[in-house]
């Protein structure tokens, strides 16, 4: 994705990494704030995949970047995650998913809505390959891990579905092009 956004759309990309086990969301937000503060650019866009979208949601709730830009979530379960809920109830997995995943996906405490002035684009996949095939039964289109309805955050600017799996969206040229389109123009290209 980084390579495609750079080569096809001219973006300078920076990757922020974090661990979901043993870390509280507040720690990750503090680290992200320091990371963003070191970026020397007039405009800063954000792209988060899966739980990364929720990290960005919490970041913009508490410490929004002062520089202008747009935000895209890729396959982020903004409402709740049936897969995480089901996996989190199994004793063998509950200790592996980490506190942050549990708090944000299994038992979120607050109804989420995008209240940030930045434009937010949401991309959901419809190719059902992933954990969701084994744990929850989806009665809707899904990317194999997250249902399309789980990606819809009230207050978003635009939402698009693409025929990709949850992990496959990271390597998809079509997803990268839609991300580039939204970051550049605040809308997705019509399919």
How would you label these PLM feature ranges?
Residues 6-7, 153:
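Anion (oxyanion) recognition and catalysis
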């Amino acid at each position: 994705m980084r390579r495609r956004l750079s080569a096809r759309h001219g973006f300078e990309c920076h990757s922020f990494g974090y661990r979901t086990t043993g870390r509280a969301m507040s720690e990750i937000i503090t680290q992200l704030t320091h990371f963003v503060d070191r970026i020397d650019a007039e405009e800063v866009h954000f792209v988060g995949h899966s739980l990364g979208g929720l990290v960005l949601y919490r970041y913009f709730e508490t410490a929004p970047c002062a520089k202008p830009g747009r935000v895209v979530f890729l396959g982020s379960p903004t409402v709740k995650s049936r897969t995480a809920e089901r996996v989190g109830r199994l004793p063998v997995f509950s200790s592996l998913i980490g506190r942050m995943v549990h708090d944000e996906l299994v038992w979120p405490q607050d109804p989420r809505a995008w209240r940030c002035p930045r434009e937010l684009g949401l991309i959901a996949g419809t190719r059902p390959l992933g954990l969701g095939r084994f744990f929850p039964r989806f009665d809707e289109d899904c990317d194999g891990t997250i249902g399309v309805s789980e990606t819809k955050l009230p207050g978003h600017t635009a939402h698009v579905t693409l025929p990709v799996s949850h992990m496959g969206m990271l390597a998809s040229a079509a997803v990268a092009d839609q991300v580039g389109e939204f970051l550049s123009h605040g809308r997705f290209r019509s399919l």
